[in-house]
Amino acid sequence: MEDDYFSITSILADNHKMSCTFALDAEGLGYLEGSTENDIHEGTKVELPFWLAQTLSVNQFTTFTLPLPYSSRVQSALVASPVSVKLSNLVGGNGWWYRWGKKLADMLEDEQATNIRNMLLRAFTGRLPTLQDLAAHHASADHTMPELSTSKAEMFRDGMEGDERELFSIGQDSGRLFKAWYDRKKGSR
C-alpha cells in the first residue's frame, strides 16, 4: 500500500469523512461546520475529511468516534463471514477500506489500533482465497457465455474495495499470461 503525498489512491483514502468533536474553542474556523458563526466552540461536532481530522486529533484539538466502517458491528460481520461483507458499501464504491483502516489505526492508541489492525488482517486473509479463485475463473472463463450476476461470486466481486479490485485485476492478468504460456507450450509439443 502506497502512502505517497502524490498518490491519487492515498488522497482518496484520506478523503473519507469523520465525525469529530472539538476539545476547545477554535476561533475563525466556523466555516468548517457550515455555520454563519465565525468560531467553533468546545463540544461542537463536525464532519471533517480524514486528513484534516487526523491533524486536528493528533494535536488534541478534536476527538473522534470510530467510523462506522470499523465498528464492532462490521467486525462481527467480518468474523461471521468475511466474503459476505460488501466493503465497497462501507467506504463508497471506489473506496479504500484497508488503506483508510491502516491510517486510522496509525493514529489510535495501542488497544484500539491493535483491534483495527487485527480486523483488517482477518478480513484480508478471509477474503483473499475467494478473490484469488474469482480472478482465476475470470481469467480463464469463456466470456461469450452470459454469466449470472446474482451468484455469490459476483456479489463478492461487486463488494470488493479498491485494493481488492487491484489484486483482482492483477490476478486476471496473471491468469491470462499463464494460460497463453501454457497454450504455447502445449502447442509446441
From Swiss-Prot:
It is found in: Nucleus. GO terms for biological process: mitotic DNA replication initiation. Signal peptide: none annotated. It comes from the Eukaryota. Its main location: nucleus. One of its GO terms (cellular component) is GINS complex. InterPro entries: GINS_A (IPR021151), GINS_bundle-like_dom_sf (IPR036224), GINS_Psf3 (IPR010492), GINS_Psf3_sf (IPR038437), PSF3_N (IPR055221). SUPFAM superfamilies: GINS helical bundle-like (SSF158573), PriA/YqbF domain (SSF160059). Component of the GINS complex which is a heterotetramer of SLD5, PSF1, PSF2 and PSF3. The GINS complex plays an essential role in the initiation of DNA replication. This is DNA replication complex GINS protein PSF3. It comes from Cryptococcus neoformans var. neoformans serotype D (strain JEC21 / ATCC MYA-565). The lineage of its organism: Eukaryota, Fungi, Dikarya, Basidiomycota, Agaricomycotina.
